[in-house]
């Protein structure tokens, strides 16, 4: 039986009712569960298997029976490894019922049906009811990028108290967390608002005092650190061990700790960031190590380089790829400026039950500090990408080149549409006679109001909705400006909401003022067939893993993805290298002066470079003015002209769209595509297929 759910359409801004099957939430959760890329992580799988084999063999040699508990079994892969290695009994628990049901089928298909499967959280297991006796070997994968963010501390503490014997071993046995302090003008753009200069370098807008004094958010910024351009940062110290977790310890793991570490500077600089990762010892002897370090700090880099068969693979991608365990950036609340190599400072490291945070001091701190949080609205309102976008110099210069020309007469009256549009406020600083700023979001508006006050801008009026714009005010408007950026947008073309607002303005006032100038005046969507090095694995079928048949898992995920996932998903492609297999092709062009026009287009792209086309990258180019000057284009795609067969350099402050292709592409040299755009309904649909022949024109 179908039901209806209310969903906001980012392109129209309207809540719409969507018909969904009763099991839609189930399919959505399955499709987004994220088990897939873990099972493509060959290093993780091989080292878990080796540790399980070695540990069980050692317990057998010591004359012990082996009773295994697998917490969070997922597909059952670790439980099957334990059974294959000779465990006497194996109990697996999985609280996510769809996954547990799938695990039961996978266990049966792999002759492992006598694994005891409990459809509960481990913390809900009752000894004597769910398990006949305690286990003496715990195998689990309870970790995330922060190590402890999925509740590992509490789960291990409960397991030792209620489910394990006193001499139980654990796989993994131990974990060590590492921190490396760094300075990066690029990464700092993700955390603070910089001065906005005009094209001559003179100051247009200064950040308010509360922004400069704000400590920011303590939360991690998870990224693929290895993909940071080497020239964009300097590490200021060697990696430092900050926390150690002994998962085999019978005594409870501490829920909160502080560790103040003395760090020596390897070069002068500003301590702005902490690069963070962890390493686990899977077996008790510590022989099976798995490190999440970026390539420059990876303990096995030389060995991995020697064994890598792809000699064209970039150095940053030699280390095993994984998207479930990445690295993280933590931002120091107040940068510490140090001038001499060899100088020492104190790095304060904290963790609670689920998260970490950091601070840095010149002198050893005497009192513990509370976890810091945003007090300026910037960090709590905008994503890291958006904060970086606000600071993006080349991007801002293109908008300012348009705005300086637009308001040069000093009689310009500007209507600004978009969330957190500082560039719109810049038009007031450039001399616009008046600026009307549509800003319906409370925190975003409060932030912009503080910018107006701090910079003493006298000619700015904020609007909660377009209905507040009086007819006489609308009649004076000479320019309508947007970046565009809206908080509800996920995919690049969700920002076509700008066109919806233009239509609303026409409906409210019958027509737009004569000769009003709209910027951006147009937008174009481009597509590029690519070969991802690794990103495609998040949607690629597993088939088999360490000798176990996982096709039932593939089938379940595929069925759910078809019902719950979008054709295109948003990804920050700078973190995921890919090679271009052709030149980009335009799929759709939108004229914002005639936004309501429906369109259907189709075409073909010939793949001219060797490679396996496993994805299509999509982005939007915004045309700020009608002239064809390339500098009037702001792109959310490649930063440099695309070279077929070469890696693409992507914008680092926006997410692009990605359509994944899970089919064999040998002998298929044409990407046939079609688009259907229905702006009044907020619908933009894509269809892609790889074929041996070009699509015939109608």
Swiss-Prot record:
Keywords: Methyltransferase, Repeat, S-adenosyl-L-methionine, Transferase. Residues 14-357, 366-698 form the SAM-dependent MTase PRMT-type domain. It holds the Pfam family PrmA. InterPro entries: Arg_MeTrfase (IPR025799), MeTrfase_PRMT7 (IPR014644), PRMT_dom (IPR055135), SAM-dependent_MTases_sf (IPR029063). GO terms for molecular function: histone methyltransferase activity; protein-arginine omega-N symmetric methyltransferase activity. Gene3D superfamilies: Hnrnp arginine n-methyltransferase1 (2.70.160.11), Vaccinia Virus protein VP39 (3.40.50.150). GO terms for biological process: peptidyl-arginine methylation. CDD domains: AdoMet_MTases (cd02440). Its EC number is 2.1.1.-. The keyword Repeat applies. Transmembrane segments: none annotated. PANTHER family: PROTEIN ARGININE N-METHYLTRANSFERASE (PTHR11006), PROTEIN ARGININE N-METHYLTRANSFERASE 7 (PTHR11006:SF4). Essential arginine methyltransferase that can both catalyze the formation of omega-N monomethylarginine (MMA) and symmetrical dimethylarginine (sDMA). Specifically mediates the symmetrical dimethylation of arginine residues in the small nuclear ribonucleoproteins SmD1 and SmD3. Belongs to the class I-like SAM-binding methyltransferase superfamily. Protein arginine N-methyltransferase family. PRMT7 subfamily. This is Protein arginine N-methyltransferase 7. It comes from Drosophila mojavensis. The gene is Art7.
């Amino acid at each position: 039986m179908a039901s209806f759910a209310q969903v906001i359409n980012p392109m129209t801004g309207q809540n719409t009712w969507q018909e969904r099957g009763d099991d839609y939430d189930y399919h959505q959760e399955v499709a987004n569960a994220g088990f897939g890329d873990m099972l493509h992580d060959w290093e993780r799988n091989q080292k878990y298997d080796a540790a399980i084999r070695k540990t069980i063999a050692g317990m057998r040699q010591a004359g012990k029976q082996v009773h295994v508990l697998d917490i969070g079994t997922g597909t059952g892969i670790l439980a099957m490894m334990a059974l294959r290695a000779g465990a006497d009994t194996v109990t697996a628990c999985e609280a996510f019922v769809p996954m547990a049901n799938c695990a039961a089928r996978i266990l049966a298909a792999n002759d492992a049906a006598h694994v005891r499967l409990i459809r509960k959280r481990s913390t809900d297991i009752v000894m004597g009811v769910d398990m006949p006796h305690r286990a003496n070997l715990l195998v689990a994968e309870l970790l995330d990028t922060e190590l402890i963010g999925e509740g590992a501390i509490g789960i291990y503490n409960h397991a030792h108290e209620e489910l394990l014997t006193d001499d139980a071993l654990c796989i993994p046995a131990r974990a060590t967390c590492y921190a490396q302090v760094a300075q990066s003008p690029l990464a700092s753009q993700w955390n603070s608002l910089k001065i906005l200069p005009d094209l001559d370098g003179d100051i247009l807008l200064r950040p308010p005092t509360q922004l400069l004094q704000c400590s920011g958010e303590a939360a991690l910024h998870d990224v693929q650190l290895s993909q940071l351009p080497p020239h964009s940062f300097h590490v200021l110290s060697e990696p430092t061990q900050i926390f150690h977790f002994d998962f085999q310890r019978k005594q409870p793991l501490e829920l909160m700790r502080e560790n103040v570490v003395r760090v020596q500077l390897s070069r002068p600089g500003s301590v702005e960031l902490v690069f963070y990762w962890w390493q686990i010892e899977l077996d008790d002897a510590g022989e099976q190590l798995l490190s999440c370090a970026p390539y420059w700090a990876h303990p096995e880099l030389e060995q991995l380089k020697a064994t890598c068969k792809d000699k064209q693979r970039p150095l940053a991608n030699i280390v095993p790829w994984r998207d479930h365990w990445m690295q993280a950036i933590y931002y120091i609340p107040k940068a510490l400026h140090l001038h001499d190599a060899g100088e020492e400072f104190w790095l304060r490291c904290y963790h609670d039950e689920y998260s970490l945070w950091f601070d840095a001091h010149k002198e050893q701190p005497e009192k513990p500090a509370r976890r810091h949080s945003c007090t300026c609205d910037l960090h709590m309102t905008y994503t890291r990408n958006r904060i970086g976008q606000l600071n993006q110099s080349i991007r801002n210069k293109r908008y300012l080149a348009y705005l300086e020309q637009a308001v040069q007469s000093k009689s310009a009256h500007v209507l600004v549409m978009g969330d957190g549009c500082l560039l719109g406020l810049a038009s007031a600083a450039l001399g616009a006679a008046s600026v009307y700023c549509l800003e319906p979001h409370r925190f975003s508006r409060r932030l912009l109001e503080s910018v107006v006050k701090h910079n003493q801008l006298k000619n700015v009026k904020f609007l909660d909705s377009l209905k507040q714009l009086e007819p006489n005010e609308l009649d004076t408007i000479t320019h309508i400006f947007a970046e565009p950026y809206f908080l509800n947008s996920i995919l690049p073309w969700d920002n076509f909401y700008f066109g919806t607002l233009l239509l609303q303005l026409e409906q409210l006032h019958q027509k737009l003022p004569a000769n009003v100038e709209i910027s951006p005046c147009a937008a174009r969507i481009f597509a590029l067939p690519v070969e991802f090095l690794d990103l495609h694995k998040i949607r690629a079928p597993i088939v088999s893993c360490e000798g176990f048949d996982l096709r039932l898992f593939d089938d379940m995920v595929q069925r759910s993805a078809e019902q719950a996932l979008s054709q295109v998903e948003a990804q920050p492609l700078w973190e995921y290298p890919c090679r271009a297999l052709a030149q980009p092709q335009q799929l759709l062009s939108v004229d914002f002066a005639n936004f309501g026009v429906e369109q259907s287009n189709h075409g073909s792209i010939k793949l001219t470079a060797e490679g396996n086309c496993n994805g299509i990258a999509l982005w939007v180019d915004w045309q700020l003015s009608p002239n064809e000057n390339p500098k009037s284009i702001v792109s959310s795609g490649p930063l440099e002209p695309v070279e077929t067969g070469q890696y693409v350099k992507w914008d680092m402050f926006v997410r692009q769209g990605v359509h994944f292709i899970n089919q064999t592409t040998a002998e298929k040299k044409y990407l046939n595509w079609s688009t259907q755009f229905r702006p009044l309904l907020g619908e933009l649909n894509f269809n892609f297929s790889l074929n041996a022949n070009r699509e015939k024109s109608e």
